[in-house]
């Protein structure tokens, strides 16, 4: 009798957890394990480690013909960053052909450019990006629920989604930060749960899980492209050019849920068509509101956050000709916490993210044709707008610090920007498909629609690298760079019996010092400038220049 009661309780607990999240999309394929069945605990009972999230996504790609999985980067701590492609079996079998057709439809520079008036022939590409801030963890749990629903649900509604879309699920953009946070909250979780905001579970020690291994905010790195997680994601964007990019976040515990539109009078990126903000985001917002109304969750929009800085993950989706948006869920910062509105639990935050993610797919499918037309107009207008402008490009020289110039050109090339080279002169034409990204990198904006905005107010990468560049009203000649392998010739170093000198003006000096010290080579540094007669003549050396003695 006790065993029967226990089994009934287990069954009811499992049934409740499933009904709480995705009852709406039943029935499900019994041959595919739910996240709870795979992990061994209900979603929201624990914070799930990144390796288990990857394992579940791998499992789904192995058992279903509606999914395929790819790795796009590896974090500093060796964790794989992956995305799961979900669509109908027919589309999964032809995914590479569909990807290339999508690019041919939207990009006028493509050799197979399709001037088609039938966007209905193409699926909408939806990029769902989760957990760029590691201690905003609800979204990665929701990613597993979303993947399971799209793959396992037998509902006609979900079938329609898969017939008309390619859904790219990136469950953990910042795996190192997530696991740092996961370790903290699971370690300090109490039984019973402690909802006191002062409890250790809800108060990570610095630096917390927000940032990556080197404590960098990956949601400020998209233009800079410094870290491997971001560089892989940038390449992902240019492989797919999604129509919709959704970025999932959390905010302060004493809040509710935010979705677009942004602040009504907020500053917006001046290079992005207003249609993005004033039309599409309004329509998406109506879908999000309806979805949260159905489950009785509170929300707000138009009162916070803005689109000033083009280096957020959501903003980069705009530069791809898509609609980039974000969700902000009030965080439980653990498993349960008391707020001014009552208790907030981890499962509650997960459900809101899950419902909003599914409504992103729904809205994208409903607006598919409009989104496809907008993206095609976006890139076509890039070329015509560039023709109308006085500035035809930006020029700069190799300069004294060749490695710094090389690093800057690397940033241009990872953003799929064309760079022309003529001896030691470089030219970046504005007339190219990523015209708006070129403007974002070179232009210096000093006027904004609002005096109050979220954070970053300056982002010119050209100025970040201190590049001495000029705008040009004339087109320039040159050969387009394919790679950086032979950007400049490295001078041969003559053998010395006394010492070697390295001027500190070079961008790669820190890397050189690291390499020399790790090789047990003695290195001295200059505390003031000096000149010296070398085999190449009299040469000035600056502060911090390196002296490597051959013998002492």
Where are these regions (language model features)?
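Sec-dependent N-terminal signal peptides
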Residues: 3-13
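Intrinsic-disorder/low-complexity accessory segments
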Residues: 18-137, 144-165, 220, 226-228, ...
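Active-site neighborhood of phospho(di)ester-bond hydrolases with catalytic His/Asp-centered motifs
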Residues: 128-130, 170-172, 245-248
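Carboxylate/His-rich catalytic cores and anion/metal-binding grooves
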Residues: 147, 164-190
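Active-site-proximal loop/turn and secondary-structure-junction residues that shape catalytic pockets
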Residues: 173-175, 250-252, 331
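Substrate-binding cleft of carbohydrate-active enzyme catalytic domains
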Residues: 179, 203, 209-213, 225-237
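Acidic, His- and aromatic-enriched active-site or binding-groove loops in soluble protein domains
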Residues: 187-214, 219, 265-282, 322-323
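Proline-aspartate-enriched helix->loop->beta-strand connector
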Residues: 237-251
């Amino acid at each position: 009798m006790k065993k029967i009661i226990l089994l009934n309780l287990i069954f009811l607990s499992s049934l409740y957890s499933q009904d709480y999240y995705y009852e709406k999309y039943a029935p499900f394929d019994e041959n595919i394990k739910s996240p709870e069945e795979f992990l061994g605990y209900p979603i929201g009972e624990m914070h799930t480690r990144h390796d288990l999230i990857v394992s579940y996504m791998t499992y789904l790609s192995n058992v279903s013909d509606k999914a395929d999985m790819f790795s796009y980067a590896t974090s500093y701590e060796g964790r794989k960053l992956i995305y799961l492609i979900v669509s109908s079996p027919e589309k999964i079998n032809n995914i590479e052909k569909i990807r290339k057709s999508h690019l041919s439809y939207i990009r006028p520079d493509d050799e197979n450019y399709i001037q088609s008036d039938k966007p209905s022939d193409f699926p909408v590409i939806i990029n769902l990006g989760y957990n760029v801030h590691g201690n905003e963890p609800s979204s990665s749990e929701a990613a597993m629920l979303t993947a399971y629903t799209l793959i396992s649900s037998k509902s006609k509604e979900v079938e329609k989604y898969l017939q008309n879309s390619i859904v790219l699920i990136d469950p953990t953009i910042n795996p190192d930060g997530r696991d740092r946070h996961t370790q903290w909250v699971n370690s300090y979780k109490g039984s019973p749960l402690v909802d006191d905001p002062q409890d250790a579970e809800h108060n990570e020690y610095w630096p917390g899980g927000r940032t990556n291994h080197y404590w960098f905010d990956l949601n400020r790195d998209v233009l800079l492209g410094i870290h491997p997680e971001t560089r892989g994601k940038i390449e992902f964007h240019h492989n797919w050019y999604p129509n919709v990019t959704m970025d999932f976040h959390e905010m302060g515990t004493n809040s509710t849920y935010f979705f677009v539109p942004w602040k009504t009078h907020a500053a917006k990126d001046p290079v992005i068509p207003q249609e993005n903000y004033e039309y599409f985001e309004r329509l998406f917002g109506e879908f999000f509101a309806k979805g949260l109304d159905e489950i009785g969750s509170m929300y707000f929009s138009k009162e916070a956050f803005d689109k000033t800085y083009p280096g957020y993950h959501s903003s980069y989706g705009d530069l791809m000709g898509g609609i980039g948006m974000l969700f902000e869920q009030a965080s439980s910062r653990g498993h349960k916490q008391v707020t001014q509105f009552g208790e907030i639990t981890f499962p509650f935050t997960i459900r809101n993210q899950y419902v909003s993610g599914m409504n992103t797919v729904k809205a994208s499918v409903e607006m598919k044709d409009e989104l496809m037309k907008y993206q095609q107009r976006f890139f076509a207008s890039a070329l015509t707008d560039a023709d109308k402008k006085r500035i035809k490009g930006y020029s700069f020289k190799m300069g004294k610090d060749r490695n710094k110039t090389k690093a800057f050109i690397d940033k241009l090339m990872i953003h799929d920007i064309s760079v022309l080279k003529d001896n030691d002169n470089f030219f970046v034409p504005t007339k190219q498909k990523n015209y708006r990204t070129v403007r974002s990198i070179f232009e210096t904006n000093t006027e904004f629609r609002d005096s109050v905005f979220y954070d970053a107010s300056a982002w010119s990468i050209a100025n970040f690298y201190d590049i001495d560049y000029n705008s040009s009203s004339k087109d320039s000649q040159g050969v387009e760079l394919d790679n950086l392998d032979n950007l400049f010739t490295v001078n041969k170093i003559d053998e010395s019996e006394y010492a070697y000198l390295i001027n500190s003006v070079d961008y790669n000096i820190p890397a050189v010092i690291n390499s020399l010290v790790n090789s047990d080579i003695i290195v001295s540094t200059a505390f003031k400038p000096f000149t010296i007669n070398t085999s190449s003549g009299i040469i000035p050396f600056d502060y911090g220049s390196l002296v490597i003695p051959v013998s002492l």
